[in-house]
């Protein structure tokens, strides 16, 4: 086992604090409408330019192992805030730094760290409750746009795009962010249910100019197995041909003779058919087939429940207003499924999301909810260079998470004002069990001014003057660092989702409390490079002639 380097008490805390400050100082320059950029060197390609706090934090690794432990703990704050709310990473880092600095001063002055931590925890719980009390619902498209704009560093076009996307696909819909191909941002909306499976044969195409298959008012048969024998599907084909409607076949696979016969019948115009593979794999495929069945009022033909494809009737087939199939995707528009059944299915999937522990599973389940309940919107980010596109994509991602959080938990005045107001209110009523807890409460409430002060500092103004003026006001009164004006933050469109502010505060206080109560730090001693003796003697080969 490697030898260890151990530091105690103040020696350990001073080193840890140095690491905290290095990381936090790098991250906090990005905060606010006039926050600066940070340039990150990459091993290959151009450097990355970003204003995203968590991206900056992830890049920082310090040489001194004790300092690095402090930096890594604050990095954890930024990551946790990012995971919980998708935004607020810089705010969380600034809060953690402020609480740690204030807390360690109190510890150095001889206060009991455990009582300080209890005081900090009490202050945080009280402020979180106060944030809930002052939040108001985020309902209008204008408010959604304002939240998106603020989170994208005052980029109004991003705010507008997100508001439009939410309007189109609803608050349950999935909104994704992709690289665009031009200079301008664009919004693509897919209505209906789309899945990533295209036509099985190009001979099904009936719109050659667009390279797509379009079926109007088709029947849809859903089969949970491979179809290789045409006899299995012949009865359904005959029934559909009599009804004079097109048919979409969604099956695990269609191969050989069955596919060839379908193609020939389509080309001769005997019956209008298109075939696609079922989306997903394994259990997920079964679940998605069931989703399509509920959306189109059909039944999945599955041997597991004793159904045979040869005996399928028109009653077991789903129907939709229109189906569009491209090389890569199938979109089912306006299925005739019962609204109540669709809602019940959505509720069932939501329950699975709550029970799931895997982020990947949650994402896939959320996609299924969107396909059933709303639709899918894709924001395509445009920029002149790849570096600019990456930076903008980070901002759009943050803005998207912030707007989702706002829809979920409402809005509070932004610009650090909500924390200042909540802290001022709590300061008048909250007391600890002893004097040292009171010190913990006071230092936590004082640290909650840090985001406002940092926003003002980054805007080139005097932080203490602005902080005093904001504290003297009440309600939504605050300072707009973008325009350098005081006024009602909600009216000026400076909004924050309380979920983002709350997550930032809770994670910052949690890690800061652990640091304040640290008394010992242990790390591996650096290994000394020992020279290989054989290698050191390497120059003596020419002495072989000595007697």
UniProtKB/Swiss-Prot annotation:
Coiled-coil regions listed in the entry: none
Any one GO BP annotation for this protein: protein refolding
Binding site for ATP: 30-33, 51, 87-91, 415, 496
Localization (cell): Cytoplasm
Keyword match Isomerase: yes
Subunit description: Forms a cylinder of 14 subunits composed of two heptameric rings stacked back-to-back. Interacts with the co-chaperonin GroES.
Family in the record: Belongs to the chaperonin (HSP60) family.
Function: Together with its co-chaperonin GroES, plays an essential role in assisting protein folding. The GroEL-GroES system forms a nano-cage that allows encapsulation of the non-native substrate proteins and provides a physical environment optimized to promote and accelerate protein folding.
Protein name: Chaperonin GroEL
Species of origin: Actinobacillus pleuropneumoniae (Haemophilus pleuropneumoniae)
Protein's gene: groEL
């Amino acid at each position: 086992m490697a030898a260890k380097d151990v530091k105690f008490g103040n020696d350990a805390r001073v080193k840890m604090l140095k690491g905290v400050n290095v990381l936090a100082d790098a991250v906090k320059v990005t905060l606010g409408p006039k926050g600066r950029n940070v340039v990150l060197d990459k091993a290959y390609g151009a450097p990355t330019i970003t204003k995203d706090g968590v991206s900056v934090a992830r890049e920082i690794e310090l040489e001194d192992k004790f300092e690095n432990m402090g930096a890594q703990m604050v990095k954890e704050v930024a990551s946790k805030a990012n995971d919980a709310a998708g935004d607020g990473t810089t705010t969380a880092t600034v809060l953690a730094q402020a609480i740690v600095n204030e807390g360690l001063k109190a510890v150095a002055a001889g206060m009991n760290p455990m009582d300080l931590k209890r005081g900090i925890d009490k202050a945080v719980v009280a402020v979180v409750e106060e944030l809930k009390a002052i939040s108001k619902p985020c309902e209008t498209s204008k408010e959604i746009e304002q939240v998106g704009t603020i989170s994208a560093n005052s980029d109004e076009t991003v705010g507008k795009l997100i508001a439009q996307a939410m309007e189109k696909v609803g608050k349950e819909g999935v909104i994704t962010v992709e690289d665009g191909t031009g200079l301008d941002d664009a919004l693509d909306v897919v209505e209906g249910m789309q899945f990533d499976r295209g036509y099985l044969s190009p001979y099904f195409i009936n719109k050659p100019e667009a390279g797509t298959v379009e079926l109007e008012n088709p029947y849809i048969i859903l089969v949970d197995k491979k179809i290789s024998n045409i006899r299995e599907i012949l009865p359904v084909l005959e029934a559909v041909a009599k009804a004079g409607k097109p048919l979409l076949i969604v099956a695990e696979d269609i191969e050989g003779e069955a596919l060839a016969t379908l193609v020939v019948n389509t080309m001769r115009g005997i019956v209008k058919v298109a075939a696609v593979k079922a989306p997903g794999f394994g259990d997920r495929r079964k679940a998605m087939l069931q989703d399509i069945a509920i959306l189109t009022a059909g039944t999945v033909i599955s041997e597991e429940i004793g159904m045979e494809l040869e005996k399928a009737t028109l009653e077991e087939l789903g129907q939709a207003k229109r189906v569009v199939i491209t090389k890569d995707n199938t979109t089912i528009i306006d299925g005739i499924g019962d609204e109540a059944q669709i809602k019940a299915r959505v509720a069932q999937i939501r329950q699975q999301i709550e029970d799931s522990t895997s982020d990947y599973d949650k994402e896939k389940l959320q996609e299924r909810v969107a396909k059933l309940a709303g639709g899918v919107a894709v924001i395509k980010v445009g920029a002149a260079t790849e570096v600019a596109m990456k930076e903008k994509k980070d901002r759009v991602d943050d803005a998207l998470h912030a707007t989702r959080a706002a829809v979920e938990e409402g809005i509070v005045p932004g610009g650090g004002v909500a924390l200042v107001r909540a802290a001022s209110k709590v300061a008048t009523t909250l007391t600890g069990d002893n004097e040292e807890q009171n010190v913990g409460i006071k230092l936590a409430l004082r640290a909650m001014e840090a985001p406002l002060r940092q926003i003002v500092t980054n805007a080139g103004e005097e932080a203490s003057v602005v902080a005093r003026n904001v504290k003297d006001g009440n309600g939504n009164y605050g300072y707009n660092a973008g325009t350098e004006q005081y006024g009602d933050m909600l009216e000026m469109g400076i909004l924050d989702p309380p979920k983002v502010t709350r997550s930032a505060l809770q994670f910052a206080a949690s890690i800061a409390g652990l640091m304040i109560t640290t008394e010992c730090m242990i790390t591996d001693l650096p290994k000394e490079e020992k020279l290989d003796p054989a290698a050191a003697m390497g120059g003596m080969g020419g002495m072989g002639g000595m007697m």
